Amino acid sequence: MTVPESPPTSPSTSTPAPARATGSDVGRAAFVTASEIACVAGSLLGAGVFGGPPVAQSAGGALSAEATLLAPAGPAFAIWSVIYLGLAVYTVLQWLPGRLASPLHRRIGWWVGASMLLNAGWLLVVRAGWLPVSVAVILALALVLGVIVRRRAEAGPVPRADAIVVDGTVGLYVGWVSVATCANVTAWLVAAGVRPGPALAQAAAVLVLVVALAIGLVLLRVSHGNPAIALAMIWGIAWIAVGRLTGAPASAVTGVAAAVVATALVVAAVVAFARRPRHRLGGPVIG
């Protein structure tokens, strides 16, 4: 009878030795790095650094802070700086010793890279004025980020640094994109000539905000109460409230509804965070 071989162990422990990086792992990390470079270039293009108008002034201003009832006020977009910084840190983190073969990065790395390419692609199509295409791209981006959230939640234990970087960055990313998707779709419809009367427009805006709340609740559940998701959504929706209550287009109904939804997300986030297993944020943590 043949005795099964035991898995290799580390010299000082009886636990299996860490997996070794493969060519696929290196290729994945290189893909993420290339995607990060494309994402940075896209963000600079979107800001008008290479010439031409910034995103807010592209496509006839359809995505400006004053374009629709669901457009967040200008300061809301500062969150992109934090998200881009987090993506840069993730890109470096995945190359550190022991990370290339990490089960977590094997599960999410390709998806993170894809999200950065979609981000850059969205900026390009908006600059080109292709609003219908921008809707398709941002929906694909939201879907990819949702997959990352789920795969992170299903991952095994990960080092605390990885948990902080991944949960923080992806949480802010998916939370903000969820709000931005609502604004993007609304901007496309308005630009396409869908202009209902004031009462119907406000009712539709309130309905979309309720949908955003539902999305936030689902994401909180799937992510085991990742507070970064709620924080980004609260940030975006609160700035919608500010925009409607203090700027144009003015809408007290939409502004108050946005404030209520943001408050509801605060409560939901606190409850979800309090109920999460002590060892989890967006998934198990070790170290």
Which role fits each region the language model picked out?
Residues 36-55:
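Alpha-helical transmembrane segments of multi-pass membrane proteins
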